[in-house]
Amino acid sequence: MKFGLFMEWPNPSVKFFSSRFDEGIKQIQLSEQLGYDYVLIAEHHFSNYGFSPAPLLQALKIAESTDRIKIGTAAIIVPEWQPIRAAEEMAVLDHFTKGRVFCGVGRGYQPYEMGGFGIGLEESRPRFQEGLEVMMKAWTEEEDWTYQGEFIKVEEPITVFPKPYQKPHPPLWLAGSSEGSMKLAAAKDITPLTSSMMGMDGVASQFGSYVRARKDLGKSVEGLQMSLQCMTHCAPTMEEALSQLPYIRWQIRAQKALTERRVVNGKTQAEPYEGEMAQDIFLDRTYLGDPESLITKFKRANDIGITNISLWMDWGGIEHESLMRSIKLFGEEVLPVLKDLNPPESSVTKAIASEEVEGTFTVTGDRLSADGG
């Protein structure tokens, strides 16, 4: 299994921007020293939910501040970008880092953020599909090309340079939770990124959709990659880990407020809401605990086919020192036990035989932060 921090720099107070960015760099540097494999950078705009409006610039800063760790986006919200510029900038970043980057993409799910760019959420899926097609063409076409879509038109024949450092392009991840996302990932050889908030039955169902889609397309189902984002805190005792729950609850409630456009002067109205996930289910789907309990939970994820874990540790104003202790303890006591694990061969067999699980979560904020569909 591979592990990396997920960064989106939440800032409930809407203050101290520079120090928040500096703290994030220190967290990433510590994770590299401890043997974490990568870092993922979110994209969010216009609120204290997350200050990551320029993921490729932030990725470049991280690259300058580290030596080895891989750097990925999770995700570039494709409908909010001019896709040729996105492809160009990602290619340049790929060269500057000598191939340390990978590109996570998503269609987005927040009407408030998209509205700020003059985009309706109902347009996000076709804009995403067209944008991804254009990005792929920009990276791979060696001769002049054009494109005619509903939203994106490239009428002047062009060839885009530079081509990426990695061939044919940086590895792609797709942030998403729907069966359609799994089918798209299968068709385009993209690594899916889903959320533990689906519950393990839901995640297993998604992996099944992905494996069956690849099988139906005549593609290999051996050695597949599947990524899982988990809200995580590692502490010496379960009691100490659970003391961080208010920070997670703020993040989830802020996410819900964004979904409902309850934002004033950039501050989300992060309040309790009807239909919040029951505490026992919430604790099952988040990863708060001592090292031993976290090892057990992550082994369960590996057993159903998960190969990559996105550790969402920075949420809701959690103290930097507490977060650094969590990163350190996880790196020293959890990572060494799990890093050599691979999913059992039976995970693919079970995935092929599995059926879709419906209704495993609702769109109430308890979801992946950069949904691809």
Residues covered by each model-derived region:
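Flexible, glycine-rich active-site loops centered on histidine and acidic residues
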Residues: 2-17, 79-147, 191-192, 198-202, ...
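Conserved, mostly hydrophobic/aromatic
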Residues: 3, 35, 43, 62, ...
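Alpha-helix-loop-beta-strand connector modules within alpha/beta enzyme cores
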Residues: 52-73, 127, 131, 327-343
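Acidic (Asp/Glu)-rich catalytic clusters
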Residues: 32, 59-67, 90-101, 184-187, ...
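An alpha-helical appendage that flanks or caps ligand/catalytic pockets
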Residues: 125-161, 201-307, 339-373
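N-terminal beta1-alpha1-beta2 module of alpha/beta enzyme domains
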Residues: 1-65, 69-71, 167-170, 348-353, ...
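Hydrophobic faces of well-ordered beta-strands that scaffold small-molecule active sites
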Residues: 3-7, 39-41, 71-74, 101-105, ...
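Glycine-rich, proline-tolerant flexible connector loops at the mouths of alpha/beta enzymes
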Residues: 38-62, 77, 197-200, 312-324
